[in-house]
């Protein structure tokens, strides 16, 4: 058999023909997940995961949203999870944004009159913000959990940023260091789950990817004044990956009239996988906020 006729396989060597997937504009195969309600969905919501992880880590959130009669859909971004691409490498951050819009358009064709929402965590929060900014009146609302708005000041000092930009020209694949999983959550069992997840990339942040994250922060800063959609913003005060000051900046800079910030004192980065009292509160806040916005979108009036 010629090699060209061999089925495309995931990085884990599973044929894509056996899995839900889409093919992006670059011809790369992206693994998809769908959580569909039993009846006709009242709304659609795309879930955008963070750097180094995959959309399967949002199963609990997705099932909760599915219980609201939402069709929840997601994919592993290029270079992540079961999608193609060198691990945690992307030619341009816009690729992530473009792929989300492609997936959104594909699903929307089947449900043309159903309101659509975005949910994003960390890097996925930055992606969601940029997606929403590209289509200012398209989405009915957005949920952001610890979004990447400002980089951590410890890792993104002026000197370190300059050094990274210089290194990107000569050693783009040099590893800057791994994500310290202990700063993700105060819940040790959740940290252990992260550390043992075979689909999580723990190879370390390459210079070229770090530069794309810095580019994303700059783009988010420019995009914030264009945001007019309703959004819920959940942030931990002790987040050492995405500076909590970014949450206040987003609240101040966006033009949205319907915007809510809930700050969790002492909480770390992954609020939906934090100590039980935090995670339960996050699920409750998301459930309540989304329920009200679905009703408002269906009635064609503000909440």
From Swiss-Prot:
Catalysed reactions listed for this entry: Hydrolyzes glycerol monoesters of long-chain fatty acids; a 1-acylglycerol + H2O = glycerol + a fatty acid + H(+); a 2-acylglycerol + H2O = glycerol + a fatty acid + H(+); 2-(5Z,8Z,11Z,14Z-eicosatetraenoyl)-glycerol + H2O = glycerol + (5Z,8Z,11Z,14Z)-eicosatetraenoate + H(+)
Phenotype of null mutants: Mice display a reduction in monoglyceride hydrolase activity and a concomitant increase in monoglyceride levels in adipose tissue, brain, and liver. Ten-fold increase in brain 2-arachidonoylglycerol levels, combined with low levels of brain arachidonic acid.
The EC number(s) this enzyme carries: 3.1.1.23
Pathway entry: Glycerolipid metabolism; triacylglycerol degradation
Post-translational modification Phosphoserine, affected residues: 189
Impact when changing residue 122 to A: Abolishes activity
Membrane topology: Peripheral membrane protein
Database matches in InterPro entries: AB_hydrolase_1 (IPR000073), AB_hydrolase_fold (IPR029058), Hydrolase_4 (IPR022742), MAG_DAG_Lipase (IPR051044)
Main location: cytoplasm
List of catalytic residues: 122 (nucleophile), 239 (charge relay system), 269 (charge relay system)
A Pfam match: Hydrolase_4
Misc: Short-term inhibition causes analgesia, while long-term inhibition causes tolerance to endocannabinoids acting on brain cannabinoid receptor CNR1, and a reduction in brain cannabinoid receptor CNR1 activity.
Quaternary state and interactors: Homodimer.
Family named by the database record: Belongs to the AB hydrolase superfamily. Monoacylglycerol lipase family.
Name used for this protein in its record: Monoglyceride lipase
Organism expressing this protein natively: Mus musculus (Mouse)
